[in-house]
UniProtKB/Swiss-Prot annotation:
Tree of life domain: Eukaryota
Residue spans crossing the bilayer: 290-310
Cystines in this chain: C40-C53, C45-C62, C64-C79, C100-C113, C105-C122, C124-C140, C148-C162, C153-C173, C175-C191
GO MF annotation, one: calcium ion binding
Chain's role: Escorter protein required for import of MIC1 and MIC4 adhesins into the microneme.
Membrane association type: Single-pass type I membrane protein
GO cellular component, one term: microneme
Protein name, UniProt field: Micronemal protein 6
Comment on protein domains: The EGF-like domains 2 and 3 and part of the acidic domain interact with the galectin-like domain of MIC1. The presence of at least one of the EGF-like domains, EGF-like domain 2 or EGF-like domain 3, is required for targeting of MIC1 and MIC4 into the microneme.
SMART domains from the UniProt entry: EGF, EGF_CA
Length: 349
């Protein structure tokens, strides 16, 4: 029996030397009672990182991974580095931390991290999006909702583009032709079809319709004033002469011409006013009431002064002076002065 064991050990040693020399698979034949034992327990081949252990009827077989060779350590066949360092020890020394160990994608609520051969990838949860952190690594950050993802600007047939404003939760809506941006009570902007009472202006800064102005703008009024011909003086000749009071006629020297006739005589040569005078008259129309009031006050003051002069002439009759009256006018009428003002006349300009 002892002789048999010695012969078996010699055969194993010889086959080991032949395998190391030729690189052929190694099989160990060990004595036993015929039962198949788990010869791979304890990872005799150095672990799954170094090689794979396969049970055989006579022992185990080591299939080493690339970069490792079969060797003998502590009288046991195993997979080891060519330099003689065991695979298990080498893996322990060269092992690096996993890419997802530092949670580069953020907390669990933000997303999950999955390791790859070249690094990791982040799968962000709802409400988060992919972004780069301060070190240039990919991570998941909170998504700033702008509403563009859910047709926040309106239906697709009404919206030309929807863009999220950087750094805010707002959005920029650009409506298509025949649509206009509207805002509701919640300050939400949407594109809706242009109502019938809307139209496009002569010039536009973008797409969509605009409301029609109920009143012409100042620019339009100026343009209409330039294109319209100036109106001629519609005052009838001799109208001021008919409105003059007897007292005013009595105080005028003979042969003099009324100021109104002189002014009309000077303006009669020009049938139309210049464009600048037309603008000034249009701009000054708002002050016509104030000017008319001032003129009326001035006329009342003049009438009071005329009445005072007439009174002084009357009172001077006691001194032997005669009161002069206008021919054809009674004394009672001369003491009462009536002032007539034509507010519709344009002579006050």
């Amino acid at each position: 029996m002892r002789l048999f064991r010695c012969c078996a050990a010699a055969v194993v040693a010889a086959e080991s030397l032949l395998w190391l020399k030729n690189g052929s698979p190694f099989f160990a034949f060990l004595p036993g009672n015929g039962e198949i034992a788990d010869n791979c327990s304890g990872n005799p081949c150095g672990g799954t990182a170094a090689g794979t252990c396969i049970n055989t009827p006579s022992g185990y077989d080591c299939r080493c991974e690339p970069g490792y060779v079969l060797g003998v350590e502590n009288d046991q066949v195993t997979c080891m580095m060519p330099s003689g360092v065991p695979m298990a020890n080498f893996v322990q020394l060269s092992e690096t931390p996993a890419a997802c160990s530092s949670n580069p994608c953020g907390p669990e609520a933000a997303g999950t991290c999955k390791e790859t051969n070249s690094g990791y990838i982040c799968r962000c949860n709802q409400g988060y999006r992919i972004s780069l952190d301060g070190t240039g690594n990919v991570t998941c950050i909170v998504r700033q909702e702008s509403g563009c993802e859910e047709n926040g600007c309106g239906p697709p047939d009404a919206v030309q583009s929807c863009r999220r404003l950087t750094g805010t939760a707002g959005r920029l809506c650009v409506c298509k032709e025949n649509f206009i941006a509207t805002i509701d009570a919640s300050a939400h902007i949407t594109c809706k079809r242009v109502p019938p009472h809307y139209r496009k202006p002569p010039f536009e800064f973008g797409k969509g319709g605009h409301p029609v102005d109920s009143e012409p703008s100042k620019r339009q009024r100026e343009d209409e004033g330039e294109s319209r011909e100036p109106e001629s003086d519609s005052t009838e000749p001799g109208r001021d002469q008919e409105r003059r009071t007897p007292l005013e006629e009595s105080q005028e020297p003979e042969g003099s011409t009324p100021d109104s006739q002189q002014s009309r005589g000077g303006s009669g040569s020009d049938s139309t006013e210049s464009e600048e005078q037309g603008k000034e008259r249009e701009e000054g129309s708002g002050h016509a009431g104030a000017i008319a009031g001032g003129v009326i006050g001035g006329l009342l003051l003049l009438s009071a002064a005329g009445a005072g002069v007439a009174y002084m002439r009357k009172s001077g009759s006691g001194g032997g002076e005669e009161i002069e009256y206008e021919r054809g006018i009674e004394a009672a009428e001369a003491s009462e002065v009536e002032v007539l003002v034509d507010l519709d006349s344009k002579t006050w300009d």
